[in-house]
């Protein structure tokens, strides 16, 4: 039996199953596919967004009938939930190899790596001759606010199974602390009771730097521990007698842009997620352009959801769903909306990969406006 409810087609079936002389009724099965009603006249995304007011909105790429009949439908041709509009600068880079750096060769015409200013990774400048700190004792001598640990470093964390116990002296685990951002808290000198990789309990007097990881875990890093540590933020109270001019720093992309990042600068990604799409990623990137980008984060309205970042441009054209009040309670739509609430911001700030993109005029416009702001 089929009936129409609020513009959505629902299928209700009853199957009688006999098992062990008992009859069971199956639950009604609801159609997962939404029946949309589309506008007849296709429009650019900007016109649709301006006329819709606040997002979200539902659209579909417009195809001429001949193209729609002959071409297989891609994700972008499916109904899309427009979720979030983005206006901001992105840094366009090309992959560079160590051979390119040594020979001075030009970057190949490879895919472009796009870095949004909200990307949470950490970089260093390749031309920077400053060196990272190599021991925790050297870090403790400066006592910065934040550092980036580039490699694994041996340390101690509280054993979660004994944290709430009545032990007079807490038990720690001796582990390798993963690379990442560390907030420097204080110096502690005391006996540390711990278990090593052989599960043997030991007790040792240690002088440690107490730090907090990105997931709010307190770690004890012994002064003799070796690694590679880049400064991120130093304290105003750092002694003038301590020379920190020749120590390597790590920067996020937003701070570098604010400080005047320009074309031709070469960066190395020290810590952060690489692009999810293949692009021959080398972690060494040469800045090609600084682009003012107008995009919208979207998602396919389907069981297999795919996130997209669409340029708000004159082409391609889209048609808009007209029957919004009728499908806003459909489970597939609600699932997609929930998925975007959870994932849209993270996706917007990921490294993206683009192909065959030339925007010299736009880049010059960004540079000119930046210089104008500096004069003001």
List the model feature ranges, each with a label:
Residues 2-376:
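Src homology 3 (SH3)-mediated interaction modules
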């Amino acid at each position: 039996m089929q009936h129409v409810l609020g513009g959505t087609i629902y299928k209700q079936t009853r199957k009688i199953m006999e098992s062990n002389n008992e009859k069971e009724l199956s639950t009604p099965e609801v159609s997962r596919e939404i029946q949309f009603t589309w506008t007849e006249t296709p429009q650019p995304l900007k016109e649709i967004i301006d006329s819709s007011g606040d997002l979200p909105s539902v659209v579909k790429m417009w195809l001429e009938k001949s193209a729609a009949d002959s071409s297989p439908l891609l994700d972008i041709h499916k109904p899309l939930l427009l979720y979030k509009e983005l206006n901001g600068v992105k840094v366009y880079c090309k992959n560079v190899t160590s051979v390119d750096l040594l020979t001075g060769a030009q970057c190949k015409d490879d895919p472009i790596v796009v870095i949004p200013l909200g990307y949470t990774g950490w970089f260093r400048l390749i031309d920077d001759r400053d060196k990272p700190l190599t021991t925790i004792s050297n870090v403790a001598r400066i006592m910065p606010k934040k550092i980036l640990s580039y490699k694994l470093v041996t340390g101690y964390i509280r054993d979660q199974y004994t944290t709430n116990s009545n032990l007079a002296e807490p038990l720690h685990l001796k582990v390798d602390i993963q690379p990442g951002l560390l907030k420097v808290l204080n110096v502690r000198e005391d006996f540390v009771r711990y278990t090593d990789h052989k599960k043997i309990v030991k007790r040792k007097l240690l002088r440690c730097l107490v730090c907090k990881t990105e997931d709010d875990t307190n770690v004890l890093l012994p002064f003799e521990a070796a690694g590679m540590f880049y400064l991120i933020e130093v304290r105003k109270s750092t002694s003038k007698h301590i020379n920190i001019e020749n120590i390597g720093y790590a920067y996020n992309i937003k701070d570098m842009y604010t400080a005047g990042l320009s074309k031709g600068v070469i960066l190395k990604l020290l810590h952060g997620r690489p692009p999810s799409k293949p692009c021959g990623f080398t972690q060494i990137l040469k800045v090609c352009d600084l682009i003012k980008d107008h995009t919208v984060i979207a998602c396919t309205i389907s069981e297999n959801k795919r996130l997209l970042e669409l340029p708000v441009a004159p082409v391609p054209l889209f048609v808009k769903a007209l029957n919004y009040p009728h499908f806003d309670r459909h489970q597939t739509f609600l699932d997609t909306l929930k998925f975007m609430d959870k994932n849209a911001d993270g996706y917007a700030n990921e490294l993206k990969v683009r192909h065959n993109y030339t925007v010299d005029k736009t880049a010059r416009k960004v540079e000119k406006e930046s210089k104008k702001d500096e004069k003001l």
